[in-house]
């Protein structure tokens, strides 16, 4: 289980709120809203409170913060080559080289990426939200495709989530076995969910949490 079913959408929701009314709606569609609401109720009202959230609580309470930071740095470092490629594909060689530098320094000097040496050495090399292949497709005007809520996964569109699968074709991600990839996704999902535990009430208090999560997904 990828365990990002609530973390990704909820995290973005807390950052951007419901300020979607003035955003560009081009390429967004929700033709399966009835099905999606059913899957949302399962993911957020059954799976999250009974499985995902308890795991996140245990992770926050019993795993030391330095260990959590190191694991987060390590999994993020694995994505740096793919982020570099996507920036080059988007015609931004400067940012591509930034992420090459991050990967090189953190892998060589940061114990394989457990320590963010690059970010500590230079503010311009701070860790940022990764640009994945879905972002590259969006850069060239490819639409999202239908919005879908998938069981055990959460928000999904063919462009952003399906397109992101292309990133697994680049090293280092291409070197991971399927169990390794599942482990990486699980760690990332648990950590993100743990960071949001104190903000659960904001989503629960929404008059329509499904719409809030859907719009937050498109505002990432």
Q: Which residues does each PLM region occupy?
A:
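Post-signal-peptide N-terminal segment of Sec-exported extracytoplasmic proteins
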Residues: 31-65
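Bacterial Sec signal peptide processing site at the extreme N-terminus
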Residues: 16-35
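Bacterial N-terminal signal peptides
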Residues: 6-16
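Mid-length scaffold segments of soluble, non-membrane domains
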Residues: 77-155
């Amino acid at each position: 289980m990828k365990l990002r079913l609530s973390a990704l959408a909820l995290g973005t929701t807390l950052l951007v709120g419901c300020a979607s009314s003035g955003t560009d709606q081009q390429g967004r569609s929700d033709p399966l809203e009835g099905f999606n609401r059913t899957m949302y109720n399962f993911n957020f009202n059954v799976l999250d409170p009974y499985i995902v959230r308890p795991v996140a609580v245990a992770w926050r309470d019993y795993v030391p913060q330095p260990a959590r930071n190191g694991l987060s740095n390590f999994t993020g470092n694995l994505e740096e080559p793919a982020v570099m490629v996507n920036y080059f594909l988007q015609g931004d060689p400067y940012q591509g080289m930034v992420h090459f530098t991050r990967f090189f320094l953190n892998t060589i000097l940061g114990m394989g990426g457990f320590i963010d040496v690059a970010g500590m050495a230079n503010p311009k090399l701070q860790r940022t939200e990764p640009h994945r292949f879905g972002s590259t497709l969006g850069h060239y005007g490819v639409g999202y495709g239908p919005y879908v809520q998938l069981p055990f996964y959460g928000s999904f569109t063919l462009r952003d989530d399906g397109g992101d699968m292309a990133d697994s074709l680049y090293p280092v991600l291409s070197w991971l076995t399927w169990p390794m990839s599942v482990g990486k996704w699980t760690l990332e999902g648990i950590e993100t969910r743990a960071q949001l535990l104190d903000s659960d009430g904001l989503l629960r208090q929404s008059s329509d949490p499904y719409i809030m999560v859907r719009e937050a997904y498109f505002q990432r």
